[in-house]
Amino acid sequence: MNKPTKLFSTLALAAGMTAAAAGGAGTIHAQQPETTVSIDDLYSYPIDSYLVSAEALNVRTKPSASSQKADTLHLGDSLKLISFSNADWAKVKYKNGKTGFVSTHYIVKAATTVKTKTKTKVYTSADGKSIKTLPADTSVSFLGWSKTNKGGFDFDWVFVDYGGTTGYMKTKDLHMTK
């Protein structure tokens, strides 16, 4: 598969999985509390690798669409996540170590492999039924965080892929290290 086709396929797969993870929840901008969550404050997760999923994405100086535009990123550009600011904005590091804010609606998590700590269940959703049980030390692809009904992130649950089956696992059941 050539590089552009592979990149497009990867982005399409990631975008589909992100949409599935959202479960149809609409974004509620006005109801989001003003919270910043640093990745390092949570755990040492392998979650800092993201890709731009839009043709062009503005980098802002503050987490607001009305703040000054600092730069523009393009489809497939990689980002390192520094922190989330609400569910709608992420502080990122991008080309040559620059930092800024981007809308989380136009980035997708780059898949990362993690392992189960113990015998672990995979669920249809964070509050759904169990669809599979995996043994300890099983590798799964970490695709992103579960989302709340209000559009925020639920850091207690992750969206994963195991052998073509996607579902949710409890964060505490996975070895999440950089």
Curated annotation (Swiss-Prot):
Keyword presence, Signal: yes
InterPro entries reported in the protein's UniProt record: Cell_Wall_Dynamics_Protein, SH3-like_bac-type, SH3-like_dom_sf
Major location (coarse): secreted
Family matches, as SMART domains: SH3b (SM00287)
Regulation: Increases in stationary phase in a strain lacking the WprA protease.
Originating organism: Bacillus subtilis (strain 168)
GO cellular component: extracellular region
Top-rank taxon: Bacteria
The entry's keywords: Cell wall, Secreted, Signal
Gene: ywsB
Disulfide bonding pattern of the chain: none
The protein, known as: Cell wall-binding protein YwsB
PROSITE patterns from the UniProt entry: SH3B (PS51781)
Pfam families reported for this sequence: SH3_3
Subcellular locations according to the entry: Secreted, Cell wall
Signal sequence coordinates: 1-30
Upper lineage: Bacteria, Bacillati, Bacillota, Bacilli, Bacillales
Limits of the SH3b domain: 47-111, 116-178
